[in-house]
A protein has these predicted regions:
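Tight coil/turn sites that cap or link beta-strands
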Residues: 71-72, 108, 116, 126
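Glycine- and acidic-residue-biased ligand/ion/polar-headgroup-sensing regions
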Residues: 82-84, 88-94, 99
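Acidic/histidine-enriched, glycine/proline-rich intrinsically disordered or flexible terminal extensions
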Residues: 146-182
């Protein structure tokens, strides 16, 4: 029995396995989503590469790759009401706020932040970070990153970002722990 058939069997027999994993491995529907690096949309001011959005995965996930330079502000404290967020550090070091605790994740570490948990992130002091993010399940989010790009270039303002919190499931919060980390 091949490993894909075995995983399909596990998916069918264990309801705790996420639906989208089963869907991706369902050989009766061999559809898939492939994003070639050369074809991915790059947002140069923010360092974000858009990989795949919710409409391309039937809402299963959205993914992007972000490169953070030394001293980058990263993302302020926020939470996603309806999506877990996966972090996979490809290179460098990232400080991550998880509710009221800050942890550091480094190259090849994987972190999953559950829906509803306040979090923030930025490269660790003196470090860069290269990170793949996955949100699941997901609303369409690519326009959120395009809005951030416009903020970086001065073509949008903070008010626009605040007005999109429900649309993009990105809800900003305050954190004394994150503010004090300097």
């Amino acid at each position: 029995m091949s490993w894909t058939v075995r995983i399909q069997e596990i998916c069918r027999n264990h309801l705790s396995v996420k639906f989208w994993i089963c869907k991706v491995l369902d050989m009766t529907n061999p559809g898939f989503t492939l994003v070639r690096a050369a074809e991915a949309e790059v947002l140069p001011a923010s360092g974000v590469t858009l990989l795949v959005d919710a409409p391309d995965t039937a809402g299963a996930l959205t993914s992007n790759r972000s490169r953070f330079d030394i001293g980058s502000a990263g993302a302020p404290p926020h939470f996603h009401a309806g999506a877990a967020e996966l972090f996979l550090v490809l290179d460098g070091s990232l400080d991550v706020l998880l509710d009221e605790e800050i942890v550091t994740i480094t190259a090849h570490d994987l972190l999953v932040v559950p829906a509803g948990m306040p979090h923030a992130f930025a490269p660790s002091a003196g470090c860069r970070a290269d990170v793949v993010f996955v949100y699941t399940p997901s609303k369409p989010r690519f326009d959120y990153y395009r809005l951030l790009e416009r903020l970086y270039t001065g073509d949008a303002d903070q008010r626009e970002l605040v007005e999109t919190q429900d649309r993009f499931d990105n809800h900003y919060v305050q954190s004394a722990v994150w503010a004090a980390r300097a």
